[in-house]
Structure formats: structure tokens, C-alpha cells
Amino acid sequence: MNVGISVPLPAYFVDVGFMARKVEELGFESFWCAEHPFIPVHSKSRFPGAADGVIPESYRHFIDPFVALARASGTTSRIKLGTGIVLVPERHPLLLAKEISTLDLFSGGRFLFGIGAGWLREETELMGGDFDHRWTQVRESILAMKELWTKTEAEFHGKYYDFPPVYSYPKPAQKPHPPVILGGGAKNVLQRVVAWGDGWLPNRITPDELRQSRATLDRLAREAGRDPSSITISVHGQPADRDLIHRLLDAGANRVIVRPATVKSEAEMGAELTRIAETVLR
């Protein structure tokens, strides 16, 4: 049973190296980190995860996912290491491609590239992203990175990113590249997954909704000439509810990612992860 663990917020109370090692020892399948480089003090954007739209105070306390996963890779040897998610419009593909390929190489091909376009307009725009066309920008960035990962001499010419032939090394351990897993529940997300992705990373979704989405995703894949089984679904941000996890897996999820409670010490985190393992894995 593929169950992953994500880092709770605030994300720096417990060493992620310790946490990832414990996750692996307990038999979980993957370890996930998310990102927001900052949260604006003044924002008109509504938080999509709350009825009142208020951004939680905990969202001020993310860590850099690539530094965190590099730390986690050094204390583990088997578990997958995922971003859940990286805000692609806020990073340049020439640098992002190298960060990913380096992490994938040094981790032995264990990286899962969970991506998103973001919901916080002020953040996206301060980082140079085009918020109103952010998924168009994400697509272009991914296509550019695929060139960098797979070509000896890579070049790309688009609206947002334009570069002449360059050498970009190292290449990732996974071939042709780490899986690109699209987050979110936007209207066209499943079409995007089939067109240029390798998986889907939904959050707020019920087993019935997932079953319908899996059927749609499989149909779109067949219509595009792709093997439906090559496209994964990873359900993010779930409670440690064994019955719910089984229903999500039965509905078509390939993995379910559980978020532990926030704790402030390694001893507390070890106990929390053990509790989750005994609840959902045993």
C-alpha cells in the first residue's frame, strides 16, 4: 500500500532528515515537501482551503523543498522524495531543471516532481510570474526543462522563456526525466496531465469524485494514444484514516499522502509517525 507522508507546518520544528529516516523505517512509500517562498503581509487573494478565505498563519512557515529533500535523501535510501508542490511560475527553468536533475541524481532516481501554478496572486507577481496565464507559463517551463533534461544541446524559444543552445548537466537519473505530477483541481487539469504530464496530485477530493476523475483520465489517455496505467494519481493532504485511504486507493489512487500533526520535537514526531503507521499500514 503506497502511503506517503508530508511535512507539516511550521515545517522547520523537526529536522527533515530525522523525519524522512523515520518515515522510511516505518514502511511509508514517499516523503513530500511543499513551498511558498513568502506570504505577503497585505493580500487580497482568498485562500482556497478555507470557507472564509483567510490565509492560515501556518502558511508563513514553509521551508525550501529542494534543500529539505536533499537533506532527506542523505538519511534515506528507498523512499520516493516529492514536491507537493513547487510553484513553477516563480522559478526559472534553467535553474529549476538543474536543481531537479541534481537531486534526482544524488538520490538515486527517487524524485517526484509535483508542480502547481499557485493561487496567491501577489506572491506570483512579486516573483515575476504571469498570474492570469500561469498554467500557460507552467506548461512552457516544463517543456523547456524536458529539453534541458534530455538533450545534449538544449534550446527553447517561447513567450516566457527563450534561450539559445546550452549545455545543462547533470542529467537526471530517471529516464527520460522524473515524473511530472500536476497539482490542483482546475477545469482542464486532466487534459493537461495527459498532454504533458505523468500524474495528477489532487487535494480536496472524495473517493466518488476520484473514481469519476480516474475514469475520465483513463479515457483521455486512451484517446491520446497513451497507456492509462502510466499516469498516476497521488491524493495529497489526507488524514490518517485507514478506511478513507483504502477507499481512495480502491477508487483509483496510486498513492495517498498523509499530513501528520504539528509537533515540536523529534520524540513527538517519532511518536506521531508511529501512530500513523499503526493506524494505516498495519
Give the residues covered by each predicted segment:
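Active-site-adjacent structural elements that line small-molecule/cofactor binding pockets in enzymes
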Residues: 1-282
